[in-house]
């Protein structure tokens, strides 16, 4: 499974893994609260963009951009590979997928044993970047 993102070229100055993790975090937060990934606002490298659905992609369109489709001289495609999380394979979501501890306090908080943070989504970012 992959998440196809169209992002402003200016965001490519950030390390790939950092940007992927941050975008995934804000997309998940929006989807969790509003059940949609459209309307996510990202601000990186002095560029503000809001997500909108564009075919099979999530396009982070710059706020000042009024075009109906992305200009790939100003935007680039970021493919975020996703893998099923180990926590998703288990029916017991109260244990930590990082250290197998039962001390995980909540799905979206840090484990009290290894201090790793968790999200309740069933997919996580692949290590490919």
Swiss-Prot record:
Sequence segments annotated as region (Disordered): 85-110
Organism of provenance: Microplitis demolitor bracovirus (isolate Webb)
Highest taxon of the lineage: Viruses
Compositional bias segments (type: Low complexity): 85-108
Biological classification of the source: Viruses, Viruses incertae sedis, Polydnaviriformidae, Bracoviriform, Microplitis demolitor bracovirus
Protein name as catalogued: Uncharacterized protein C3
């Amino acid at each position: 499974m992959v998440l196809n993102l169209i992002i402003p070229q200016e965001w490519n100055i950030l390390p790939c893994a950092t940007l992927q993790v941050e975008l995934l975090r804000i997309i998940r937060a929006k989807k969790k609260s509003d059940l949609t990934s459209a309307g996510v606002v990202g601000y990186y490298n002095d560029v503000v963009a809001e997500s909108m659905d564009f075919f099979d992609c999530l396009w982070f369109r710059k706020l000042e951009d009024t075009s109906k489709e992305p200009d790939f001289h100003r935007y680039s495609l970021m493919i975020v590979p996703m893998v099923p999380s180990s926590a998703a394979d288990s029916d017991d979501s109260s244990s930590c997928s990082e250290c197998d501890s039962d001390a995980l306090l909540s799905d979206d908080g840090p484990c009290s044993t290894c201090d790793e943070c968790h999200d309740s989504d069933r997919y996580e970012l692949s290590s490919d970047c």
